[in-house]
Design a protein with these regions (language model features):
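Flavin (FAD/FMN)-binding glycine-rich loop and adjacent Rossmann-like elements that form
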Residues: 27-28, 72, 131, 136, ...
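Short beta-strand "acidic-cap" motif of Rossmann-like dinucleotide-binding folds
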Residues: 59-64, 339-344
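Beta1/beta-strand and adjacent pyrophosphate-binding region of the FAD-binding site
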Residues: 32-43, 309-323
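Structural detector for internal amphipathic alpha-helices that build alpha-solenoid repeat scaffolds
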Residues: 682-695, 703-707, 712-727, 735, ...
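Conserved N-terminal glycine-rich FAD pyrophosphate-binding loop of Rossmann-like flavoproteins
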Residues: 66-91, 347-370
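A conserved beta-strand/loop element that lines the FAD pocket in flavoprotein oxidoreductases
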Residues: 125-135, 397-410
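Short beta-strand to alpha-helix junction loop
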Residues: 102-117, 378-391
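Amphipathic alpha-helical scaffolding segments comprising HEAT/armadillo-like alpha-solenoid repeats
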Residues: 666-677, 694-707, 726-750, 773-790, ...
Length: 931
């Protein structure tokens, strides 16, 4: 795990630990560190200025708005040496060093090469830097002297103290807003803008000129064979002799405000589109920039103060996020007659399938809006990711959607307990409010819901269980690649920034670029008016307010925590269908808001079935129609006519009339429940009905256990009782654990994980770990004997089950056993120092990366499980120098740059020794959303 570790500047620690708040003005926090200089912007000239300041002995921080440095070069696809002619020679040499391994080679630098060169330049100079943070406003004292910089990220706004700010933004926006730069823009002279694209065909449009600025190389739709869905349109080429084109067009005189630039951006995208486009720049740029644009501006004093938190726009429906669910929501709301603004961080519409690199559907129902979308995209052109993004963008514009690209929402605008908009940072740093009559949170991590005060679920002091994520390569011509290599909290820009930096450092030189959307499968979720559980999914529950359908298997990408899954979990071939109720999109109390996508209200173990792209597109569309209806009728989102909405959804093909007419699922009668328990086995649907109605089922299960005569049957009932937290069968379970040797366990697996993440003995141990078993000697001894049989090479699931059982029983006498396990060779010491940047194993390969990151997560989860349990058992092992080992181990993770581990360790420590672990994240549990 230590192999290939890169040591970064210690200052990176402070940058990564920059704290922020909910996003509302007046609710911000300051960074922990002060800086001599803060460079606003991740441009190449910003990096040069930062290195120069560091060489002069100053403490420097660079704050970059995109997922990586280099928005002026990589973000605009200006990749020739002449594009960096004004840069210092030492930096030009790094940026444009020959790269014979690039595939395909266009004779220019690749965007990834630019980003990695800038990463390296700052790291070697000892400059701290953070991406995913938009510089907004320069703060000053009463005399105008600079005191720091306001930045905006996906977790709110933060303030960085500094004596000097260097404006290195694309448009010198901070210098212009504070009166430190006045551009000489003739009021009667047209401005010529440029946009670079990669295509075979020369872009052509009225008034547009296109010049080739690279060599040509063959780009092929190599992954089209994976699925007809991502194949080229009929008549579109599958092999393209592509090159970089610089496209220029003149526009009438105007300003360089963010909204003016956005209009030009969309017009340039219209003009530069070709059927065989393989990539395109995120930003336009001035072909002949006036003095002041494209260079750094040192600002120690401001001349004028910009207005504080202006209203940027007022609209009917605001959709935050233009990804898998958000883009369909925006289109649906606009089709429903609403005026729509859609705010999106990325440079393209479409989310994970266009900007995240996972283009091909896995499962899901390709019906409704998804069917329309697929049919439309199939006619567009050669390369699926580009074609899908363009179809969505154009379809939205056809109905009046105002797409705000490269803009970062930071939190909700709340008035009297109602969401009335969101705070947004525009690409030029302008920060203000977008007010709306209805808001759809399509961020995927419940940003607006969380900042509005809604309950959310993700990381906690419970067991650390997170579905795996990854950062993907962008390869010209390829629309689909999948990976699972680390854990990440999408809501935390520090965590995303660190893992993106790791991924870039790990990618091979053949890579064209890095994706800008996190390919994660589990994120912060809103706790809504209804929470969809595993039991709902497995029992096929009907809802009176069904608005979407889902279809998949339990592709868990790691371990599960639902108690039912400790008894039995469906295998890979077991596909299930589920309905999604409207209430799962509504907050418990907050009005004015719907939450869609991975942020909707559902148990983490139910999400693998609910999160398929095809289904999320349809549920997003349903949310957009609901928002439009609420605005049209002037009612709250929770008070819309659901039957009317369902009629629209049936007409669209998103749900069937039979879904609407089906009687809502009701609890089993006493007789039915007794019959179900009497014949209960490993049938998932039957188990689901029992686990969903646990309070009524438990007395029946106890009687069945007592009456059982066959040992296997008695053990089965004891197992189910234990999983439900009942100790009636504890002696039977303990005897079974004692009688069975350790079986084949499970080591952590992200990609390709289907079925159980526990062995049978593991599941018996976990069933023993309920509080009612405290003080039962047979239970304690069974756990102890199994712990004694573990060694350094034992499977992770065995360590996990022993730790969970010991922690659950709360037997302090097991502390010595846990301490011994934690002291085994190779078990401890897997936390990272704040300055470490280990390569991700397997990431340099040109493949699907099956297995990447598994071993790292395996050893960290094992160490944390043992340390957490030992700490909660009082952490007094009686082994002399091992006393306090659990706490000491947890504290090694407190400053780990992998924030998922750090947040978990801090939460456990904050709870103290006496805290009891929850199931794994504060999720809705069986029975909490029962019939």
């Amino acid at each position: 795990m230590k192999t290939g570790t890169i040591l970064l500047s210690a200052l990176l620690v402070a940058a990564l630990q920059l704290q922020a708040a909910s996003g509302a003005p007046g609710d911000e926090k300051a960074a922990d560190s002060d800086y001599d200089v803060v460079v606003a912007g991740g441009t190449s000239y910003g990096v040069a200025a930062a290195v120069e300041a560091a060489r002069a002995g100053k403490k420097v921080l660079v704050v970059a708005p995109r997922s990586a440095l280099g928005e002026d070069l990589a973000g605009t696809l200006r990749l020739r040496p002449e594009d960096g002619a004004s840069l210092p020679s030492w930096l030009r040499e790094r940026l444009y060093a020959p790269n014979p391994d690039a595939r395909p080679s266009l004779g220019v630098a690749t965007p990834l090469q630019v980003k990695k060169a800038l990463d390296g330049a700052l790291s070697e100079a000892g400059v701290a830097f953070r991406c995913w943070l938009q510089p907004c406003d320069i703060a000053a004292d009463a005399d105008g002297l600079v005191t720091g910089l306001w930045v905006a990220g996906r977790d709110g706004r933060a303030f960085v103290k500094a004596k000097e700010v260097v404006d290195a933004t694309l448009w010198a926006s901070l210098a212009r807003r504070t009166g430190n730069l006045v551009l000489d823009l003739p009021p009667d002279q047209e401005a010529k803008f440029a946009r670079n694209v990669v295509s075979g065909e020369r872009p052509s449009a009225p008034g547009l000129t296109a010049t080739a600025v690279s060599d040509a190389a063959e780009v092929t739709t190599a992954d089209a064979a994976l699925s007809p869905q991502i194949a080229p349109a009929p008549g579109a080429p599958s092999n393209v002799s592509a090159r970089v084109w610089r496209c220029e067009k003149s526009f009438p005189p105007g300003d360089l405000s963010a909204r003016a630039l956005a209009r030009i951006e969309h017009e340039m995208r219209d003009a530069t589109w070709t059927r065989d486009q393989a990539d395109a720049a995120d930003f336009v740029y001035l072909a002949d920039p006036p003095a002041g644009i494209g260079r750094a501006h040192r600002i120690a004093k401001i001349v004028r103060r910009p207005p504080e938190t202006p209203v940027l726009a007022e609209t009917d429906v605001l959709v935050v996020g233009a990804g898998t669910s958000g883009a369909p929501a925006a289109i649906a709301a606009a089709r429903g007659g609403a005026k729509v603004v859609c705010v999106e961080y990325a440079g393209r519409v479409g989310g994970i399938s266009t900007e995240g690199g996972i283009g091909r559907y896995c499962f899901g129902l390709r019906r409704g809006f998804t069917s329309e979308l697929d049919a439309g995209v199939s006619k567009v052109g050669s390369f699926y990711a580009c074609c899908k993004a363009e179809w969505l963008r154009r379809e939205g514009r056809r109905y009046g959607v105002d797409w705000w690209l490269c803009a970062q929402a930071t939190g909700a605008v709340v008035e009297n307990g109602r969401v009335v908009g969101a705070f947004v940072a525009l690409p030029d740093g302008t920060y203000g409010a977008v007010r709306a009559k209805a808001v759809v949170d399509a961020t995927g991590y419940a940003l607006i819901a969380a900042s509005a005060g809604a309950r959310t679920e993700f990381l906690s002091d419970g067991e650390l269980s997170v579905q795996g994520a990854g950062s993907l390569t962008r390869v010209l011509g390829r629309s689909h690649l999948n990976t699972d290599a680390f854990f990440v909290d999408d809501a935390d820009p520090a965590d995303v920034s660190y893992e993106w930096l790791r991924a870039r450092a790990s990618f091979g030189p053949w890579v064209w670029d890095q994706t800008s959307v996190v390919s994660s499968r589990e994120r912060r979720r809103m706790r809504g008016a209804y929470c969809v559980t595993v039991q709902d999914v497995l029992s096929g529950r009907n809802y009176p307010d069904v608005v979407a359908l889902a279809h998949s298997n339990f592709d868990t990408h790691g371990q599960t925590v639902d108690p039912q899954f400790s008894v039995h979990i469906p295998e890979r071939k077991h596909l299930v269908s589920s309905r999604i109720p409207y209430r799962a999109l509504l907050p418990e109390k907050t009005d004015g808001l719907l939450t869609v996508g991975l942020g909707m209200s559902a148990h983490r173990d139910a999400m693998p079935v609910l999160r398929m792209q095809a289904d999320l597109q349809n549920s997003g569309y349903a949310a957009g129609l609901a928002a439009a209806q609420a605005v049209r009728k002037g009612v709250e989102l929770r008070d819309i006519d659901v039957r009317e909405l369902q009629g629209e959804l049936v007409a669209k093909g998103i749900i069937d009339a039979s879904d609407v007419s089906a009687a809502p699922s009701a609890p089993l009668s006493d007789a039915e429940l007794s019959t179900t328990v009497a014949s209960l086995d490993y049938d998932d649907a039957a188990l689901a009905r029992v686990f969903a109605d646990a309070s009524r089922a438990l007395p029946i299960l106890r009687r069945a256990y007592a009456a059982a005569r066959e040992p296997e049957r008695k053990l089965f009932y004891a197992h189910v009782l234990g999983a439900l937290g009942d100790a009636s069968g504890a002696e039977t379970l303990a005897a079974a654990v004692d009688a069975a040797p350790w079986d084949d366990g499970w080591n952590y697996r992200g990609m390709g994980q289907f079925g159980a993440s526990l062995s049978r003995v593991d599941s018996y141990l976990i069933a023993l770990g309920c509080a009612a078993n405290r003080g039962r000697p047979a239970v304690v001894e069974a756990i102890r004997r199994k712990a004694a049989d573990l060694g350094p090479k034992s499977a992770y699931s065995h360590f996990r089950s022993v730790a969970k059982a010991a922690e659950g029983v709360g037997a302090g006498e097991l502390a010595a056993d846990l301490s011994r396990l934690l002291s085994l060779p190779g078990v401890r010491g897997h936390a990272l120092a704040p300055s470490a940047l280990p390569r991700i194993e397997g990431y340099a390969k040109d493949s699907t990366w099956i297995g990447a990151g598994n071993e790292e997560r395996n050893v960290c989860l094992r160490e944390l499980a043992l340390a957490r349990a030992l700490y909660r058992l009082g952490d007094s092992s009686g082994l002399g120098d091992s006393s306090g080992l659990g706490e000491r181990t947890l504290r090694t993770y407190v400053d780990d740059p992998r924030r998922v581990y750090a947040v978990h360790a801090r939460s456990v420590l904050a709870g103290g020794h006496s805290a009891r672990s929850r199931s794994g994240g504060g999720e809705c549990l069986p029975g909490e959303c029962a019939f």
